[in-house]
């Protein structure tokens, strides 16, 4: 059978940075932290460079079959990711010196409620990227984590309105009954305004170093949620909702606050050579989003 990729010469010569496939759907067993592998439904991209300016093209089936072997006979961890990239280059030894792979999937975690001890599933979007170039291996991990953000400015304005309502209610009284105030504060006439809040999402990308023996997906998610303190919940009873309201009231934040809190936490981590983050507050007051971005700020590192 004719093999055009091997036998034909390019009509127009030139080297290409990446050639391969995207939007490959496949199941994967993913090894994270110290947990048993979890099956995920992934979307993959695989590429090698075309370093021979005269070659017609690469051998895409060689990349696909190696990816399929990983899916059916192994699990995705740092070791197999390295081997996969090396296999891409070896199978194209006459054409390529660099390889790239990207996996996108949702990673499911059981999350406990704040007070009631109930549990539910949460799905976190995850991206794993591997690069191999002339023996230099790099791996990136990205997670997206939803949380709630309550506007500090709106909270201050709401408090002012409550103060004004209190003054109007009791301004003419020289003595105020404690029980009456207690009941008034628990009524809609007492709490006349509430601050606006919204579901928000932070995207965090880190470059892993040799201290990582596996993908620290859960560790990174836990770090983000612990830092922000208001993660979106799964199973919720009334006592959990009340605790969530308390956490939001005690952790008011602009997008700048969220970005700085995470920046500080990520700077303390030794497993990450670099980091990049983007905070997205999907405003309930405005028709636009409030966004803050930052990086570790190292030379030659990520750019915002």
UniProtKB/Swiss-Prot annotation:
> Which UniProt key words apply to this protein?
Hydrolase
Q: Which InterPro entries match?
A: GTP_cyclohydrolase_FolE2, GTP_cyclohydrolase_FolE2/MptA
Write out the pathway annotation from the protein's UniProt entry: Cofactor biosynthesis; 7,8-dihydroneopterin triphosphate biosynthesis; 7,8-dihydroneopterin triphosphate from GTP: step 1/1
Reaction(s) catalysed by this chain, per the record, are: GTP + H2O = 7,8-dihydroneopterin 3'-triphosphate + formate + H(+)
Q: Where is this site: May be catalytically important?
A: 151
A biological process from GO? tetrahydrofolate biosynthetic process
Q: Does the keyword Hydrolase apply?
A: yes
The catalytic activity of this protein is classed by the Enzyme Commission as 3.5.4.16
Example GO molecular function: GTP cyclohydrolase I activity
What family is this protein classified in?
Belongs to the GTP cyclohydrolase IV family.
Per its UniProt record, what PANTHER family does this chain match?
Answer: GTP CYCLOHYDROLASE MPTA
Q: What does this protein do?
A: Converts GTP to 7,8-dihydroneopterin triphosphate.
NCBIfam families with a match to the protein in the record: PRK13674.1-1
Cite the HAMAP family for this sequence.
GTP_cyclohydrol_B
Q: What is this protein called?
A: GTP cyclohydrolase FolE2
Annotated organism of origin: Psychromonas ingrahamii (strain DSM 17664 / CCUG 51855 / 37)
Its lineage opens with:
Bacteria, Pseudomonadati, Pseudomonadota, Gammaproteobacteria, Alteromonadales
Q: What is the name of the gene encoding this protein?
A: folE2
């Amino acid at each position: 059978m004719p093999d055009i990729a091997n036998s034909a010469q390019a009509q127009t010569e030139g080297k290409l940075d990446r050639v391969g496939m995207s939007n490959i759907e496949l199941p994967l067993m993913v090894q994270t932290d110290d947990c048993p592998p979890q099956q995920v439904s992934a979307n993959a991209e695989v590429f090698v460079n075309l370093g021979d300016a005269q070659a017609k093209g690469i051998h895409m089936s060689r990349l696909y079959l190696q990816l399929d072997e990983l899916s059916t006979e192994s699990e995705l961890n740092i070791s197999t990711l390295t081997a996969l990239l090396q296999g891409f280059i070896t199978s194209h030894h006459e054409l390529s010196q660099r390889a790239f792979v990207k996996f996108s999937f949702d990673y499911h975690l059981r999350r406990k409620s704040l007070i009631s001890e109930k549990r539910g599933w949460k799905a976190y979007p995850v991206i794993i990227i591997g690069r191999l170039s002339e023996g230099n291996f790099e791996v990136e991990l990205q997670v997206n984590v939803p949380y709630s953000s309550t506007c500090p400015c709106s909270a201050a304005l709401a408090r002012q309105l409550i103060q004004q309502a209190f003054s109007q209610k009791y301004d003419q009284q020289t003595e105020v009954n404690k029980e009456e105030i207690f009941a008034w504060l628990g009524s809609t006439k007492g709490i006349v305004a509430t601050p606006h809040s919204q579901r928000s999402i932070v995207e965090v990308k880190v470059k892993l170093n040799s201290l990582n023996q596996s993908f620290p997906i859960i560790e990174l998610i836990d770090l983000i949620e612990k830092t922000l303190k208001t993660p979106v919940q799964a199973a919720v009873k009334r006592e959990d909702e009340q605790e969530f309201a308390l956490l939001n009231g005690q952790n008011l934040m602009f997008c700048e606050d969220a970005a700085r809190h995470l920046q500080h936490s990520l700077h303390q981590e030794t497993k990450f050579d670099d980091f990049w983050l983007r905070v997205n507050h999907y405003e309930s007051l405005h028709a636009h989003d409030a966004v803050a971005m930052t990086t570790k700020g190292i030379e030659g590192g990520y750019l915002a």
